[in-house]
């Protein structure tokens, strides 16, 4: 206890706070307590850190091994595809030019048929569009003609002519009724 009070006394008489680097002047008991506490609590923390690091390393190694196996499988599959392609290349070379020429002719024939179908479809579409436009123009012309006729009739009809037209139409309807009876 005397050492503790001496240290407080020496602190108050000291000119400032400083670190005593002389190991012989420091209190060995205090240092051993601090080191003991650090070792006791630090051991668990350090152990946890090392365990976590060990788990991360082992999981990384395991995933790397799995990736390596996957890459090896993919490499084997790629080699198998390469062998198949090489076999097909040899087969095509054996069959030779005649097969290629036949396929070329078939493609040309199919393209020609498709072209004719597209041409027919284009012509049919143009024809239908022309008919639609003609029908639309006819409707517009008919509508305009009816509007002009109505305008002409309305401008020329007076009440007397209007009454005569109505009477004439009534007479026509009566005559048609008599014929059907």
UniProtKB/Swiss-Prot annotation:
The keyword Transmembrane helix applies. It is a single-pass membrane protein. It is found in: Plastid, Chloroplast thylakoid membrane. One of its GO terms (molecular function) is proton-transporting ATP synthase activity, rotational mechanism. The chain crosses the membrane at residues 28-50. Keywords: ATP synthesis, CF(0), Chloroplast, Hydrogen ion transport, Ion transport, Membrane, Plastid, Thylakoid, Transmembrane, Transmembrane helix, Transport. GO terms for cellular component: chloroplast thylakoid membrane; proton-transporting ATP synthase complex. In plastids the F-type ATPase is also known as CF(1)CF(0). F(1)F(0) ATP synthase produces ATP from ADP in the presence of a proton or sodium gradient. F-type ATPases consist of two structural domains, F(1) containing the extramembraneous catalytic core and F(0) containing the membrane proton channel, linked together by a central stalk and a peripheral stalk. During catalysis, ATP synthesis in the catalytic domain of F(1) is coupled via a rotary mechanism of the central stalk subunits to proton translocation. Component of the F(0) channel, it forms part of the peripheral stalk, linking F(1) to F(0). F-type ATPases have 2 components, F(1) - the catalytic core - and F(0) - the membrane proton channel. F(1) has five subunits: alpha(3), beta(3), gamma(1), delta(1), epsilon(1). F(0) has four main subunits: a(1), b(1), b'(1) and c(10-14). The alpha and beta chains form an alternating ring which encloses part of the gamma chain. F(1) is attached to F(0) by a central stalk formed by the gamma and epsilon chains, while a peripheral stalk is formed by the delta, b and b' chains. Belongs to the ATPase B chain family. PANTHER family: ATP SYNTHASE SUBUNIT B, CHLOROPLASTIC (PTHR34264:SF3). This is ATP synthase subunit b, chloroplastic. It comes from Cryptomeria japonica. The lineage of its organism: Eukaryota, Viridiplantae, Streptophyta, Embryophyta, Tracheophyta.
């Amino acid at each position: 206890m005397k050492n503790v009070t001496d240290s407080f006394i020496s602190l108050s008489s000291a000119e400032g706070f400083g670190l005593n680097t002389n190991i012989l002047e420091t209190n060995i008991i205090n240092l051993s307590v601090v080191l003991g506490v650090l070792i006791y609590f630090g051991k668990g923390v350090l152990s946890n850190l090392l365990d976590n690091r060990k788990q991360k390393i082992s999981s990384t190694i395991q995933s790397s091994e799995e990736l390596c196996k996957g890459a090896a499988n993919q490499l084997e599959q790629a080699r198998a595809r390469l062998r198949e392609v090489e076999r097909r290349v040899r087969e095509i070379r054996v069959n030779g030019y005649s097969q290629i020429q036949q396929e070329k002719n078939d493609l040309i024939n199919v393209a020609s048929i498709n072209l004719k179908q597209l041409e027919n479809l284009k012509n049919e579409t143009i024809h239908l569009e022309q008919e639609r436009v003609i029908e639309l123009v006819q409707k517009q012309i008919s509508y305009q003609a009816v509007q002009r006729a109505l305008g002409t009739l309305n401008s020329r009809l007076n009440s007397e002519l209007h009454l005569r037209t109505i009477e004439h139409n009534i007479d026509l309807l009566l005559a048609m009724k008599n014929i059907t009876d």
